[in-house]
Amino acid sequence: MNDFNELINSSKPTLVDFYATWCGPCKMQAPILEELKSKVGDTANVVKIDVDRNQEVAARYHVRSIPTLIVFKNGEPVWRASGLHQLDVLEAKLKEHI
């Protein structure tokens, strides 16, 4: 979890996908996040947190439904949404904070 804390405290925006392996919408979100990762390159971070394996982190950020997406910058959440989101929406949210 030290790596997670380093990432969210970065001056680069970090999109965190709180997901579960059994979640249908999470599985649909995964390829969109992979494409987003390649599009933003090193200007932003995109990471996935399995809520079943990291329950304390999910609880800390009050994740009640999945997928939940949170953009962090300098350790602070600057955008949050639940459910499936398209590439253009996610890319725009990250670019707002670059």
What are the residue ranges of the model-derived segments?
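Hydrophobic beta-strand anchors of alpha/beta hydrolase catalytic cores
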Residues: 15-16, 46, 69
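Short pre-active-site segment immediately N-terminal to redox-active cysteine/selenocysteine motifs
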Residues: 11-12, 19-22, 65
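Typically the conserved alpha-helix immediately C-terminal to a functionally engaged Cys/Sec
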Residues: 27-40
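Chalcogenol-based redox active-site neighborhoods
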Residues: 60-61, 87
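Structural microenvironment flanking redox-active thiols in thiol-disulfide oxidoreductases
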Residues: 51-57
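A short beta-strand-turn-helix
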Residues: 1-13, 55
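Non-catalytic, surface beta->alpha helical segment in thiol-disulfide oxidoreductase systems
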Residues: 73-98
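Structural micro-motif
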Residues: 62-70
